[in-house]
Design a protein with these regions (language model features):
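A short, basic/flexible loop-to-alpha-helix module at the beginning of a structural domain
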Residues: 1-11
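Residue-level preference for short coil/turn positions at secondary-structure junctions
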Residues: 7-9, 33, 100, 120
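N-terminal Rossmann-like FAD-binding beta1-loop-alpha1 element of flavoenzymes
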Residues: 11-39
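Glycine-rich active-site loop/strand segments that organize a redox cofactor
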Residues: 42, 49-93
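Feature captures the FAD/FMN-dependent oxidoreductase FAD-binding
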Residues: 79-132
Length: 132
């Protein structure tokens, strides 16, 4: 599936943010046979805090193995407390392994979310003024 260049006019699930939470949500949807979703990320890449905080010495404050997902365990961490670049790299591996770029629109900020009760759906206003 090619990457999305514009959000579709309607999607079953919109995931706001491509940090760990958004990534895991997207993977779990796929594992349950749901592919009608989009990930909206205001940043330029996946990774959330691990994308944004790669200053010298940045590292996790819990043991690295806790950054492994139960369905995608990582056992080859280089240190007991992994540094930011290694965590970011493991996130990128998940993105590649689950083809998440095909479902993501980067550099896309969600400005507002409004529930449309009469239609039983959410309407998202994006920074480029489009509506999803």
């Amino acid at each position: 599936m090619p990457p999305l260049h514009a959000p579709p006019p309607h999607t079953k699930v919109a995931i706001i943010g491509a940090g760990f939470g958004g990534i895991v949500m997207a993977i779990r949807l796929q594992q349950h046979g749901i592919y009608d979703f989009i990930i909206l990320e205001k940043g330029s890449d996946f990774g959330g805090t691990w994308r944004d905080n790669q200053y010298p010495g940045a590292a996790c404050d819990v043991q690295s193995h806790l950054y492994s997902l139960s369905f995608a365990p990582k056992s080859n961490w280089s240190k007991r407390y992994a540094e930011a670049p290694e965590i970011f790299s493991s996130i990128q591996d998940l993105v590649t392994d689950y083809n998440l770029r095909a479902f993501c629109r980067l550099n896309t900020e969600v400005l507002a979310a409004h529930y449309q009760a009469e239609r039983c759906l959410w309407q998202l206003q994006l920074q480029d003024q489009s509506i999803l």
